């Protein structure tokens, strides 16, 4: 969006706080319905980030696929779970939780220290002027497809494998 700098910065901070609070809600809330709604807040904030960066197609896809389908499916599955069985042996803090929080905190701290020191100017997508002219003739949807199948093929495959493992884990948890 073409917004003045102060409004754009305010929206970035507001959406960032929404992401942080929603992420904490997903992790810390004990009721799975509330966690699913917090996940919906996180996904909506991500789509609003895409709108702020003028990626309207990706924002619409984010809303339709993740909020409209995946999050509704999660809420639907959680509603069919037996809630009284879920809370019987619920311990707030275990050894695995401590190890997981230690690993996540160390990854977070390392990212916070590495990202500001990285030279982002060395990352150049197009080096020739004819590539820039050719990219202007291709629509946004085609550019997304080209980048997903060439530049971002490996990360795209990793994300699809992670989503597949998460889906298999959700099915395994639902069957127990």
From Swiss-Prot:
- Which EC numbers does the record give? 7.1.1.-
Q: Which UniProt keywords apply?
A: Chloroplast, Membrane, NAD, NADP, Plastid, Plastoquinone, Quinone, Thylakoid, Translocase, Transmembrane, Transmembrane helix, Transport
Q: What domain of life does the native source organism fall in?
A: Eukaryota
Q: Does the keyword Nucleotide-binding apply?
A: no
The record's annotation in PANTHER family points to:
NAD(P)H-QUINONE OXIDOREDUCTASE SUBUNIT 6, CHLOROPLASTIC
What's the protein called, per UniProt?
NAD(P)H-quinone oxidoreductase subunit 6, chloroplastic
One Pfam family matching this protein: Oxidored_q3
Where is the protein situated, by its record's location annotation?
A: Plastid, Chloroplast thylakoid membrane
Which species does the entry assign this protein to?
A: Manihot esculenta
Q: Which parts of the chain span the membrane according to its record?
A: 10-30, 32-52, 61-81, 95-115, 152-172
Matching entries from InterPro entries are given as: NAD(P)H-Q_Oxidoreduct_6, NADH_UbQ/plastoQ_OxRdtase_su6, Nuo/plastoQ_OxRdtase_6_NuoJ
Outline the subunit composition.
NDH is composed of at least 16 different subunits, 5 of which are encoded in the nucleus.
Q: How does it sit in the membrane?
A: Multi-pass membrane protein
Q: Does the keyword NAD apply?
A: yes
Q: What class of enzyme is it?
A: translocase
């Amino acid at each position: 969006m073409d917004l003045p700098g102060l409004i754009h910065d305010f929206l970035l901070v507001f959406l960032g706080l929404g992401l942080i609070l929603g992420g904490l809600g997903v992790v810390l809330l004990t009721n799975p319905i509330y966690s699913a709604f917090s996940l919906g807040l996180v996904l909506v904030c991500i789509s609003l980030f895409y709108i702020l960066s003028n990626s309207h197609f990706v924002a619409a896809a984010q809303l339709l696929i993740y909020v409209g389908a995946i999050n509704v499916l999660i809420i639907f599955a959680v509603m069919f779970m037996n809630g009284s069985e879920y809370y019987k042996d619920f311990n707030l803090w275990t050894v695995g939780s401590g190890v997981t929080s230690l690993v996540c905190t160390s990854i977070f701290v390392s990212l916070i220290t590495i990202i500001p020191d990285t030279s982002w100017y060395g990352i150049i997508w197009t080096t020739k002027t004819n590539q820039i002219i050719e990219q202007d003739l291709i629509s946004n949807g085609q550019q997304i497809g080209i980048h997903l199948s060439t530049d971002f093929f490996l990360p795209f495959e990793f994300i699809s494998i992670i989503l597949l493992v998460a889906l298999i884990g959700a099915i395994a948890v639902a069957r127990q």
